[in-house]
Amino acid sequence: MIFAANLKCNHTRASFKIYAKILNKTMGVKCDDIIVFPPSIAFLENENNFIQGAQNFYPCVNGAFTGELGKEHLDEFGIKCVLIGHSERRALGDEEFIKAKFDFAKEHGYKIVFCIGENLDTKNSGKTLEFLKKQLEIIDLNYEKLIIAYEPIYSIGTGVSAQSTDIAKVLEFLASLTKVPLLYGGSVNENNIKEILSVNHCGGVLIGSAALKVENFIKLIKG
């Protein structure tokens, strides 16, 4: 099972250093199934027993792109895993860069956690699967370092997870399109994680607020 934590705009380098130290000690040995996406200002240079990923990047090595992070910056911290397509990035106008980001990350051999998800209107109109398929049309579903995270927008940060029957329907559909690992994200917490992980085709979870405290994240990992 893959356990990924998206810390979003939380933690400083000082606090994430403590977070990483505790997680490293708990893990004991390197585990590629544990991924943490800290804010870029908190990236750590030291070796960790988990994969440190980037929440965002610009599809370039470097250049005249004010305020952006290029491959050169990720390389400095040994980062080879990126999050692409999160709905909070799409809402900020990231939609047009998604294909460019995916193609760049694939070209350079990054592990990619690619997020997809529908809003409540799309769900209620019965067009979820059609919508998700369209989101996936721009990427290579056979890329060997791809992970797909299904995060229904109506569940992100709301405290209300999607129903397990809905999750199962979506993951079964996605499994018919690709053989890569499939994650669920959207208000994952200690009360629902066991049920979510028991859904057929679920290969793990992408956790938000419930992973902000390392002790909580560890508890979710250990089950």
Curated annotation (Swiss-Prot):
GO molecular function, a single term: triose-phosphate isomerase activity
CDD domains cross-referenced by the UniProt entry: TIM (cd00311)
Residues noted as binding substrate in the record, renumbered to the chain: N6, L7, K8, G157, S187
Subcellular location: Cytoplasm
The keyword Isomerase is annotated on this UniProt entry: yes
Entry keyword set: Cytoplasm, Gluconeogenesis, Glycolysis, Isomerase
Stored InterPro entries: Aldolase_TIM, TIM_sf, TrioseP_Isoase_bac/euk, Triosephosphate_isomerase, Triosephosphate_isomerase_AS
Reactions the enzyme catalyzes: D-glyceraldehyde 3-phosphate = dihydroxyacetone phosphate
Cytoplasm in keyword set: yes
Quaternary structure (record): Homodimer.
NCBIfam families, A to Z: PRK00042.3-2
Biological role: Involved in the gluconeogenesis. Catalyzes stereospecifically the conversion of dihydroxyacetone phosphate (DHAP) to D-glyceraldehyde-3-phosphate (G3P).
Protein name: Triosephosphate isomerase
